[in-house]
């Protein structure tokens, strides 16, 4: 098949997300990046332990396994990206504070151009996977946030997803449905169906399923009826990549020399120390322009309406 064909046995998503041999035309939004950065790890889980060369534990992972396997962050020194630490291998310039790892060949190449033939990737396109099914099941158990009777079951399945990535679990460890009470950390929060639904909508589904499936996030927002609301909320959130005290992220490169990455880390905007010129804001145009009647669904193709003159007849 032609490289550009939609029916080829390969895809080109790696070219869109990668800064190394790719076009980096798809970059994680600021709010999503910050949500990944702020995920709380389970400090009881040995997968989050960091050891020195002597085998001695010296601390914990800075970012969750879910974050590290979804996006590349310049200061994620416990993960690799195209053969090296992210801050060594990737440029992180032009306000590029993160890159999607999903769909890229970061684990087998040092550059996407290493593929043969080039611009072709054999990574499967994830239409749906078990985590999505678990999260939809949890949503059903609380009936979209209206029924508390299914809370325990919903939490059980959300926590199965979180446990896979060694993230702090939700709910109370004393709950009858707490499967990992002895070996995992729970946040000990008492949830209602509504508060758990909000967590599903704004944290769990977007972080677990980012850029997967066929427009999963777009369809989720549409079926919940909150697309415009979400755009408006996110357009009010401010972030910045301004280096603290003007100090860049510094690491040691492949050649043993010092490497500096300026403006490569994302922070929450603080008006007391940051200027308006330093702010990064998501979805400003979308918040102003989105119209549900016009944009929620694609129009029926002209070819279909021409071929079927009775399409709109009632």
What are the language-model segments listed below?
Residues 1-4, 58-314:
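Acidic/polar-rich alpha-helix caps and helix-coil junctions
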Residues 1-53:
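Polar, glycine-rich mid-to-C-terminal structural blocks
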């Amino acid at each position: 098949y032609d490289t550009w064909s939609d029916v080829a046995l390969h895809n080109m998503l790696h070219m869109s997300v990668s800064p190394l041999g790719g076009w980096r035309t798809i970059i994680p939004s600021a709010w999503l990046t910050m949500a990944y950065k702020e995920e709380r790890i389970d400090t009881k889980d040995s997968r989050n332990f960091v050891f020195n060369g002597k085998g001695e534990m010296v601390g914990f992972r800075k970012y969750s396994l879910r974050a590290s396997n979804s996006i590349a962050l310049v200061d994620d020194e416990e993960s690799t990206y195209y053969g090296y630490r992210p801050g060594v291998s990737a440029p992180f310039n032009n306000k590029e504070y993160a890159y999607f790892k999903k769909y890229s060949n970061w684990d087998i190449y040092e550059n996407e151009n290493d593929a043969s033939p080039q611009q072709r990737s054999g990574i499967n396109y994830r239409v749906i996977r078990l985590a999505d099914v678990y999260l939809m099941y949890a949503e059903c158990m609380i009936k979209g946030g209206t029924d508390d009777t299914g809370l325990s079951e919903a939490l059980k399945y959300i926590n199965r997803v979180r446990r896979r990535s060694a993230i702090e679990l939700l709910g109370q460890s004393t709950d009858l449905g707490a499967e990992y009470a002895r070996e995992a950390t729970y946040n000990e929060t008492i949830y209602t169906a509504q508060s758990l639904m909000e967590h599903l909508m704004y944290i769990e589904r977007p972080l677990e399923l980012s850029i997967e499936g066929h427009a999963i996030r777009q369809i989720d927002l549409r079926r919940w009826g909150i697309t415009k609301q979400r755009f408006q909320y996110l357009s009010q959130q401010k972030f910045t990549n301004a280096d603290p005290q003007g100090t860049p992220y510094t690491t040691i490169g492949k050649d043993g020399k010092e490497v500096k990455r300026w403006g490569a880390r994302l922070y929450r905007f603080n008006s007391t120390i940051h200027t308006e010129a330093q702010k990064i804001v998501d979805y400003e145009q979308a918040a102003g322009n989105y119209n549900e009647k016009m944009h929620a669904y694609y129009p029926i193709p002209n070819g279909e309406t021409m071929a079927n003159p009775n399409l709109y007849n009632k």
